[in-house]
Amino acid sequence: MPIDNLPPLREVIDIYGLQAHKSLGQNFLFDLNLTSKIAHQAGNIEGKPVIEVGPGPGGLTRALLAKGALVIAIERDERCIPALLAIEKHYPKKLKLICNDALKQNFSKLFETYPEKPRIIANLPYNIGTQLLLNWLLVEPWPPFYESMTLMFQREVAKRITAKPQSAYYGRLSVLTGWRTTAKIAFDVPPQAFIPAPKITSSVVHIIPRIQPLTCSAQKLSFVTKTAFGQRRKMLRQNLKTLGGEMLLAKAGIDGTRRAETLSISEFVTLANLVI
């Protein structure tokens, strides 16, 4: 059943000549049943502000608007703007378009005058998805400018985001995500839901900020985790040599022969708090 009376997305892509560009990490999501499922995963968004990054031809945008959201869509690719303007005309005063690179967008400033925090709901471009997430995880002040994030990533990235200690996917991204938020994989999205179809499965991850994460400098924790996971197979006393090595680990009560993937988030926080 159609969510609106706008043309089907395949038709929109043809009308505006929107071939996905690999250089922009684009894979257009055209299955409107799935876009509605993503919008539903974010909870009740009627009358709520929503940030969407990389809307492309507007498949997810339409699902968000159909559920009553007030959408602020940030799109770098100017080719997509005419298709998005057609959606804006269909939903007057419900869609705001910003033509900008999301990596350069000051999100905190954009929403400082809004009466309530936005939710971030997006099928993120593959080539900038991880960096955008890191930017949003490390933003200051905390609690952040957003209420929650419902984001699509490559399945492997989603596993890294939600991984636990002692697992192959556990790494810097897992620690930084788990420190400040709770995250879960909501569902998978098959390749055939996209144009063009990628070679891998994607996953939607739902992320909610912790109001009071363990006290720690975001910059220090980011640096310590980057250093600790620099060479995964090496012992911590080797990887953390430049930060104090055995002495630092002894202060933290951590065995220097352990590897980074065995440490809990709280142990990483302890290390970061000891770094001068």
From Swiss-Prot:
Record SUPFAM superfamilies: S-adenosyl-L-methionine-dependent methyltransferases
Protein name: Ribosomal RNA small subunit methyltransferase A
E.C. code: 2.1.1.182
Organism: Bartonella quintana (strain Toulouse) (Rochalimaea quintana)
Catalysed transformations (reactions): adenosine(1518)/adenosine(1519) in 16S rRNA + 4 S-adenosyl-L-methionine = N(6)-dimethyladenosine(1518)/N(6)-dimethyladenosine(1519) in 16S rRNA + 4 S-adenosyl-L-homocysteine + 4 H(+)
Protein localization: Cytoplasm
Role this protein plays: Specifically dimethylates two adjacent adenosines (A1518 and A1519) in the loop of a conserved hairpin near the 3'-end of 16S rRNA in the 30S particle. May play a critical role in biogenesis of 30S subunits.
Keywords noted in UniProt: Cytoplasm, Methyltransferase, RNA-binding, rRNA processing, S-adenosyl-L-methionine, Transferase
GO MF terms held by the record: 16S rRNA (adenine(1518)-N(6)/adenine(1519)-N(6))-dimethyltransferase activity; RNA binding
Chief location: cytoplasm
Entry GO terms, CC: cytosol
Binding site for S-adenosyl-L-methionine: N27, L29, G54, E75, D101, N123
Similarity annotation: Belongs to the class I-like SAM-binding methyltransferase superfamily. rRNA adenine N(6)-methyltransferase family. RsmA subfamily.
